[in-house]
Amino acid sequence: MIVGVAYAKPTVQVWKHVDVPEGTSAREAIERSGLLAQFPEIDLAVNKVGIFGAICPLDRTLAEGDRVEIYRPIHPEAELLEKKR
């Protein structure tokens, strides 16, 4: 089955389609996507993940067409930085 795995930084967004077997978890799809090697700053012990904007555990079993999103931690002063713009 085909699922998507997405990660975004302020300067680059990546969305990969990954062919995975039935029963694949979010963690397994992320590992198969190659994004952990491409973006070594991703730490699955720290970064939250979700499917279509809803946070989920890494062991969540995926369905055909799901989009797994890897979220960056929010900077503690992000709101202040946004107001300065």
Curated annotation (Swiss-Prot):
Protein name in UniProt: Protein RnfH
Xref: Gene3D superfamilies: RnfH-like
Pfam families: Ub-RnfH
InterPro entries tied to this protein: Mopterin_synth/thiamin_S_b (IPR016155), RnfH (IPR005346), RnfH_sf (IPR037021)
Protein family according to the UniProt entry: Belongs to the UPF0125 (RnfH) family.
UniProt gene name: rnfH
